[in-house]
């Protein structure tokens, strides 16, 4: 088994995404992952230093400030998780394109809860630079987000694995989920640039195709 195959199997086991999934895709508790962001890690190191200093110098106010900030950070984990849980995803519209033009896939996100979902970002897992602008979902609403995938070959293009993430509310925690809607787009061959003109009619042929340049179609 090659390293790439092992990595693909490990990711399928870890993220529970083995290929295109039937709609609707529901983001349950087991599909959401939570880790601190770089800012969250920096804050954690700072809080650890504050705690050690408070212990060393017996600072009551230092303890209070450390645990107060730590409690706020802990609560942000809960809010980041709730921002994604129970969302439903279904594939939207994807029109055919010519090779070389980006294929645009519509993704429908359904929020059945009575609370808003804030600061969401959607992007292809293997291409984070193609991320959407941060967007919100109103309570009991459906929103459409568009993912543009570059095309290099003609034929059917399958929508790759996507990542939906949030860093709401404080940017300390990154919560995300991976999924792959069963959606594809037809990519036509690109038209030839500066193509030669079509050949003129041949007078030696009979029938309707025998008309050459300058012949009238009507008597």
Regions found by a protein language model. Give the residues of each.
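Extracellular/lumenal glycan-associated context and N-glycosylation machinery
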Residues: 1-87
């Amino acid at each position: 088994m090659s390293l790439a195959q092992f990595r693909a199997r490990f990711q399928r086991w870890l993220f529970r995404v083995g290929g295109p999934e039937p709609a609707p895709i529901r983001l349950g508790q087991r599909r959401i992952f939570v880790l601190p962001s770089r800012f969250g890690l920096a804050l954690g190191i700072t809080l650890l230093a504050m705690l050690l200093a408070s212990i060393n110098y017996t600072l009551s106010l230092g303890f209070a400030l450390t645990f107060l900030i730590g409690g706020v950070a802990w609560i942000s984990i809960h809010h980041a998780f709730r921002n994604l849980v129970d969302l439903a995803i279904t594939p939207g519209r994807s029109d055919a394109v010519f090779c070389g033009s980006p294929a645009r896939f519509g993704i429908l996100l359904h929020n059945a809860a009575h609370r808003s979902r804030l600061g969401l970002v959607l992007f292809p897992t293997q291409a984070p630079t193609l991320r959407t602008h941060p967007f919100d979902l109103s309570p009991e609403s459906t929103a459409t987000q568009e993912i543009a995938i570059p095309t290099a070959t003609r034929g059917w293009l399958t929508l790759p694995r996507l990542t939906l993430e949030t860093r709401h509310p404080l940017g300390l925690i990154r919560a995300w989920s991976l999924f792959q809607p069963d959606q594809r787009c037809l990519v036509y061959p690109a038209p030839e640039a500066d193509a030669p003109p079509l050949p003129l009619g041949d007078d030696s042929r009979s029938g309707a195709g025998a008309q050459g340049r300058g012949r009238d179609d009507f008597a």
